[in-house]
Amino acid sequence: MAGHTDNEITIAAPMELVWNMTNDIEKWPGLFSEYASVEVLGRDDDKVTFRLTMHPDADGKVWSWVSERVADPVTRTVRAQRVETGPFQYMNIVWEYAETAEGTVMRWTQDFAMKPDAPVDDAWMTDNINRNSRTQMALIRDRIEQAAGERRTASVLAD
């Protein structure tokens, strides 16, 4: 059995701002609440290889792994995968962005499978990722909408 999640949120902000803020990997610790640090290991055109390190969990364990992301600004999609898979057999993520009358819809689709010796199974991880994705997406929405509001205010003041 494999796990699959599909979550989306509408952000009341222009596509360009949402795209730029969510693809500025070095600033992810300020966008997501779960990441303590990001280290970019390499760049090749639209492909970025980086190490993510989370804040310690309730047991004090710090999780860290290497991922790759390939951003396509034309189709407004990002494809990512874990290079260091940890407890996963594989983990693939697709980020999709779409403009709507209300702003920008950001969608995360994750497909994965846990290793047989992982401490949790696919069903547990699916629930965990769904819960965490909703939390992180709401936080990202709030931070981007705040930045959009600050830009509107600065633009009005400059006029």
From Swiss-Prot:
This is Putative polyketide cyclase. InterPro entries: COQ10_START (IPR005031), START-like_dom_sf (IPR023393). Pfam families: Polyketide_cyc. Involved in developmentally regulated synthesis of a compound biosynthetically related to polyketide antibiotics which is essential for spore color in Streptomyces coelicolor. To polyketide cyclases. Coiled coil: none annotated. CDD domains: TcmN_ARO-CYC_like.
